[in-house]
Regions:
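Histidine- and acidic-residue-rich, metal-dependent catalytic cores
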Residues: 1-207
């Protein structure tokens, strides 16, 4: 299974049934990775805070989408479902805008599925048209999805996941990607995110 199939299935499965435990863990993981990556890129503290918040909340729009496709059989209506799924970035941005979040955070959430080569969504933006915060979250979101357990597959180990990211490097800003590579090779961020994704977190795991 290639990266495109993994991430597509991840988005569909997430929207069929939003598990708040998993959603919070994924948001925490993306937040940690994004803030560390912003630091690696030399961003200032204010920007690092914004990208950490946006990373935590980047998938909030999925909470509005899941009721529309909940209960449908997974082998039917895939095209329609993907159209719903692709609304989540804009819906998330709309939610945060209504709640008064900083516009930079709103934009990071809105554009976090845009690809550097213009193949992303919702607007097929390319290159530096995409805000740098969204470019940061993009690579962190993909990596986090790959190292997370899903109902249809086990998590990939970090080395395998990074290899899959390399295979799709055209989707990412090369400056951001190279900083991401340095970060995961020289810091403890993988251990920290592994705990967030798979460890026991007081309060989160309590039923």
């Amino acid at each position: 299974m290639g990266l495109a199939e993994v991430v597509t299935e991840k988005n569909l499965e997430d929207c069929y049934s939003v598990d708040m435990n998993d959603a919070v863990r994924h948001g925490m993981c993306v937040s940690i990775l994004s803030s560390e990556l912003a630091s690696e890129l030399g961003m200032d503290d204010a920007f690092i805070h914004k990208v950490a918040v946006a990373g935590m909340l980047h998938d909030v729009g999925k909470l509005q989408i899941s009721p529309y496709i909940y209960g449908r059989r997974r082998n039917t209506m895939k095209i329609e479902e993907m159209q719903y799924v692709r609304l989540h970035a804009k819906l998330g941005a709309d939610i945060l805008s209504r709640e008064g979040y900083d516009q930079d955070i709103v934009d990071m959430v809105h554009y976090h599925h845009e690809n550097y080569d213009g193949s992303g969504y919702p607007y097929r933006m390319r290159g530096d048209e995409i805000p740098i915060g969204a470019r940061i979250i993009r690579v962190c979101d993909v990596f986090s999805a790959l190292v997370s357990d899903r109902p249809y597959r086990r998590a990939f180990d970090a080395d395998t996941a990074f290899g899959m990211v390399i295979d799709e490097v055209r989707h990412f800003d090369m400056k951001v990607f190279l900083a991401f590579q340095r970060m995961i090779n020289t810091s403890d961020v993988i251990e920290r995110t592994d705990y967030v994704l798979h460890g026991s977190i007081p309060g989160l795991d309590e039923k």
